[in-house]
């Protein structure tokens, strides 16, 4: 029955996009509520010539 196949494909498609959307929302809220990470800039030391 083609109608049932279309409904099944549509429901599977909508379910997959809903799960993807909810996962991204969960990740966003987790990042906002978690402790902020402290990023240190690497201490760039310029190489000194050997003759100095």
UniProtKB/Swiss-Prot annotation:
Localization, UniProt: Mitochondrion membrane
Which species does this protein come from? Lycodon semicarinatus (Ryukyu odd-tooth snake)
User: Per the UniProt record, which residue ranges are transmembrane?
Assistant: 10-30
In terms of superkingdom, the source organism counts as Eukaryota
Know the name of this protein? ATP synthase F(0) complex subunit 8
Instruction: Please tell me whether the keyword Ligase is annotated for this protein.
Output: no
Q: How does it sit in the membrane?
A: Single-pass membrane protein
Known role: Subunit 8, of the mitochondrial membrane ATP synthase complex (F(1)F(0) ATP synthase or Complex V) that produces ATP from ADP in the presence of a proton gradient across the membrane which is generated by electron transport complexes of the respiratory chain. ATP synthase complex consist of a soluble F(1) head domain - the catalytic core - and a membrane F(1) domain - the membrane proton channel. These two domains are linked by a central stalk rotating inside the F(1) region and a stationary peripheral stalk.
Q: Name one GO cellular component term.
A: mitochondrial membrane
Q: How does it assemble?
A: Component of the ATP synthase complex composed at least of ATP5F1A/subunit alpha, ATP5F1B/subunit beta, ATP5MC1/subunit c (homooctomer), MT-ATP6/subunit a, MT-ATP8/subunit 8, ATP5ME/subunit e, ATP5MF/subunit f, ATP5MG/subunit g, ATP5MK/subunit k, ATP5MJ/subunit j, ATP5F1C/subunit gamma, ATP5F1D/subunit delta, ATP5F1E/subunit epsilon, ATP5PF/subunit F6, ATP5PB/subunit b, ATP5PD/subunit d, ATP5PO/subunit OSCP.
Main location class: mitochondrion
Name the family the entry cites.
Answer: Belongs to the ATPase protein 8 family.
Can the keyword Transmembrane be found in this entry's annotation? yes
GO annotation terms (biological process)? ATP biosynthetic process; proton transmembrane transport
Alphabetically list the UniProt keywords: ATP synthesis, CF(0), Hydrogen ion transport, Ion transport, Membrane, Mitochondrion, Transmembrane, Transmembrane helix, Transport
């Amino acid at each position: 029955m083609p109608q049932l196949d279309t409904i099944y494909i549509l429901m599977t498609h909508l379910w997959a996009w809903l799960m993807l959307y909810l996962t991204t929302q969960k990740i966003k809220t987790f990042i906002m509520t978690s402790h902020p990470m402290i990023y240190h800039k690497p201490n760039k030391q310029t190489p000194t010539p050997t003759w100095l």
